């Protein structure tokens, strides 16, 4: 059985104990730096120029590492401390990360963290340091002036579902949103409040007849952000649909059949978008009204076309139900107005397996109390 004796006495004071220690050799640790440099040279034949503090930290972090790892450290090709990994650990579990870290490693780690966020180093509890880091990241996202390293850390945080609860806490404790410009923020930002502010600014711009290209470009970037999936407003894509919608192909509609095809293929998405905005903003009529106005303009063009064609309507659907029910296979019959047709069409377009559809006509369209075509 192997036994290790540890003592702080000099060799001359060990007396008979030295005989036991010398059985397998005596390791003198009163000069740890010299000991590490000597054994490192014996192992890899490299005289490293690492400063003492960094060398000691490397030794403490070397457990489980290979000689190739040590070669990279000794030659200055790699840093002994994986700051990004340790920072992710800190953000995910501040208290346990600090508790399990050697005090010398913690000191160098915190120095590198403060350098990364561009702030003077101060003594902080782990939880406060973690919030300080996230506040720096949020500041960079809000101003769209964030370093590549901090943006990478943020993306790693948003991609980890086990950090969702921690991220929600960090976001809730961030207090510098009041003066933020929603159009200047990085599109990956995690603030639903900025999406609401953007909606209100766009509403005001529509009401005043302003140029909207800058808004739609930003909204498009926000919609496409994969990192903001859990944080952005679901209705942003509906805002884009309403603002950009044009009845460009309506002039080609020459029959009721053309009209039905046009509605399903082109106009139904606008009805869907407005329905989603009503669900989200119906109690904020002031901000919703300009978007409703855009919708009503497009709807009027659609209804004008319908009434122009309806006078030529001739019944052509006698026996339609009997004909369809006589077919083989499973048949679904939906009796609905245009609003429900729009919902059904949305579901149909999202279905993986497309089935054949036939549509019957009502005599006249209707308009709901909120102005939706039906």
Q: Residues of each region from the PLM?
A:
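…; additionally, a secondary subgroup of soluble metalloenzymes is captured
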Residues: 1-330, 338-374
